[in-house]
Amino acid sequence: LIHMNFRSWCLNTNTDVAVILPSIKQGESAQAYYRSQKKYPVLWLLHGTLGCYNDYLRRTNIELYATENDLIVVMPSALNSNYSNWSNVIPPFHMFDYLTEELMPLIYGWFPASDRREDNFICGLSMGARGASKYAFNHPEKFAACSCMSGVPSDIRTIMEEGAQNPFYAREKITVEQAGGLDSFLNSYENVWDKVETVAKMTNPPRFYFCCGTDDGVYPNWLHFKDYAEKIGLSAVFDER
C-alpha cells in the first residue's frame, strides 16, 4: 500500500492518492517477482461526497480483494468536486481532466500498471459513481468496465424543467452554471445522458453495472435512467435491493 502526496498541475494544489499494489506470494523469489516486468490490471476507485481517498481502505476489504486478484487499485482524492473541471475558481481545479490527463500517465509510468483498455476498470460510490460514469461515457476507449454504486447519469433537461420540486435541482443547477449555462452544459463532457446512446451503439462498449438500494434517495433517478438505458439498448446490469 502506497500513499502519495504530490503537486498536481491540473488541480493547482497538492493532492493525495492511495495505491494498492500486488503482493509477492509466499515462497516466490523476490528478485524474479520484482524484475518480472509483468503489467497488472488497474481499478480506478472513486470516493463519494464528503469522503476522501482512504474511504475504501478504512471501511471495506478492498486491499484483501486486490491482493487476491493481483489487481492495482488507485484511489484519488477528489474533495467535493463532483469530478468536474472548476474553471471559475482561483486557481482553477480541473478534477475531470486530472484523472485521464495526469494521474493515469503517472500510474502507467511509475508502476507496473497495464494501460490496455481491457485491463482498466472504473468504479465509484455516489459522487464517485457520477464521476465513474463521466469517465466511462466520455472515454469509453479507456475502460473495459464501469461500476456505479448509488449514482447514475442525470437527465438534466427533465431536472431543469421540474425545477425546485426535483430533489437534485439545486446541485445540477450549480453544475449547469459552472458549465456556462444549459447550452454549454449540453455540449460538454458533463452531459453524460446524451453520450449514453452513442456508447450503446459501439461495437465493443465497456461493460456497465449500476446498483442502488430501494430506500436510497437516488432510487427514482436510478429507475428513470434504467428505463432510458433499456429503451436505447445499453447493455448493462441493473441491480436493486
Describe every region a protein language model picked out.
Residues 1-241:
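Non-catalytic cap/lid and distal C-terminal segments of serine-dependent acyl enzymes
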